[in-house]
From Swiss-Prot:
Keywords: Cell inner membrane, Cell membrane, Cytoplasm, GTP-binding, Membrane, Nucleotide-binding, Ribosome biogenesis, RNA-binding, rRNA-binding. Residues 15-22 are annotated as: G1. This is GTPase Era. It is a peripheral membrane protein. CDD domains: Era, KH-II_Era. Residues 124-127 are annotated as: G4. It comes from Geobacter sp. (strain M21). An essential GTPase that binds both GDP and GTP, with rapid nucleotide exchange. Plays a role in 16S rRNA processing and 30S ribosomal subunit biogenesis and possibly also in cell cycle regulation and energy metabolism. One of its GO terms (molecular function) is GTP binding. Its main location: cytoplasm.
Amino acid sequence: MSEKKFRSGFVSIVGRPNVGKSTLLNRILGEKLMITSDKPQTTRNRIKGIHNVPGGQIVFIDTPGIHRAKSRLNKFMVDEALSSVQGVDLILFLVDGAVDPEKEAGMIKEVLSGVDAPVILVMNKIDLVPKGELLERMSCYGDTYPFKEIIPVSAGTGDGVEQLVQLVHGLLPEGPCYFPDDILTDVPERFIVAEIVREKIFRLTHDEVPYSTAVVVDSFKERENGVVAISATINVERDSQKGIIIGKRGDMLKRIGTQSRQEIERLLDTKVFLELFVRVSGEWSDNSRMLKEFGYE
């Protein structure tokens, strides 16, 4: 009896903003690694999430949502997403199942033009699709592009996610174990900490404020008593945004700090001392030097 081959590879997750890419990956990993919010364009960088299955390893790549870029930051985000479909073994193209497929057809054809890797269309949020319309919508997507498979899932409830993972694993080539099996991601803890703080800003503030913030971890040190001391700066573009982030009598900054600290403590499994500062950094989202300084290269 022949030994089962080990399958592994890189799988890019792409789609419009707010279709549930990060939520899906968190569900697959069984851990909250990717930040999420109900606002579009929460994800800014490509982040790898490593999922080990019996007989294989899947390296998922979470990407920013594909949208019309205005600032240099937006262009960076879109470039991150579009470049991720090259050189991978498989692509998961995520769509909101509740959206009319005809509205997505043009974007799908444009993004996947010239792509060599097989593509699975993942229809997310199927719990929001009216009864009786699911098969019709799947058929419409099938006329748009020669997808390898069309899979309906709900990242929120978990419906269909395990079947998706099994399908992905089966389509990957034979290959090595790229990462140790106890590694969840290839990004450092400092990056994840900055993302957690940014997520709280997205969840607690509104309008242009979350889109105008960049979080930089200035120091990350473990003290002799085991407490991790973290200092981070929240960069904004205008004085008015700084005032909103700080809030009346510092209340908003306190809420951001408390919620961030609690999640960072769960992540690091230790006590955390978190110090947050707010700085006005001008129009940083359109400044090449600052974008590089803040990690958007």
